[in-house]
Amino acid sequence: MKLGDLEFWLLTDGTFRLDGGAMFGVVPRSLWERVSPPDGRNRILMAMNSLLIRAAGKWILIETGAGDKWDAKSKDIYSFEGSPRLPEKLVARGIPPEMINIVINTHLHFDHCGWNTRLVNGEAVPVFPNARYFVQQGELDHAKAPTERDRASYFPQNFLPMEKSGQWSLLDGDAEVVPGVELIRTPGHNRDMMCVRMSGGGKTVFFFADLIPTAAHLPYPWIMAYDLYPLTTLENKKKWIQQAAREGYLVIFGHEAENPAGYLREKNNKYALEPVELDS
């Protein structure tokens, strides 16, 4: 899809499953299972969506999926599926990892930065050797010293190698990495997660990351139990849902498997997705 001089494509690193109760927090299963049917282990299906962007003469990748550094037990817990994986999809488009100039991690949970690195002779090394990796300074600091509540979401192999290679570009607040691609600190899920806004040609696209992970999470109180600051999530959901609907943003969800993109339509102060197909 083109936005003026900017062009982007929706990619995915496949699907995985997480517990539906954890994904919908205080919402009763009798409600959420109508829109996200669970499997026999109470897990719902989710995608790991990424965006490939061409802007200002650079190749930019937003999110790097779950990667492949998983043991058999973890693969069973999360039921990773999908082939080819993200790096192979880039190569199929004629974009080998060496061509990526910028990698944006909205945050450093394992399902958003897994292909930051891969194992070579047992050592995790950057997949994108010529890229600058962007994340909030506060998120990297927290990832290196997480709490007991969220420690399982962070894998040091996904982010420490970029310190060794000197590839981190650390942010302190909002930033425009190239003209038309803006990173917006949006706390709630954690303190320093970011959403991404792309603009050009009179159009705007908003990538929700984990602020609103799926279309089923559009109702204001449908907030993940994983969120460290749920009331802040609530405030930011209201702000960005209303703004996206009012200004006609095309929105993209980080984990929506069925209808990952579309426009928000409001009726009686409730919002629904009008899905659209994107190039992939």
Positions of PLM-derived features:
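Hydrophobic/aromatic beta-strand patches that form the interior of the parallel beta-sheet core
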Residues: W9-L11, I104, F134, S169-L171, ...
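Metal-dependent catalytic neighborhoods of phosphoester/phosphodiester hydrolases
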Residues: C113-E123, Y263-L264
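Short, P/G- and charge-enriched loop/turn segments at secondary-structure junctions
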Residues: S36-R41, N121-G122, L183
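Cap/insert and terminal regions of metallo-dependent hydrolase folds
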Residues: D76-E88, G201-S280
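Active-site metal-binding loops of divalent metal-dependent hydrolases
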Residues: D13-T15, T64-G67, L108, G138-E139, ...
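Metallo-beta-lactamase
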Residues: M1-I95, M99-D111, V127-R185, N190, G202-A209, V276, ...
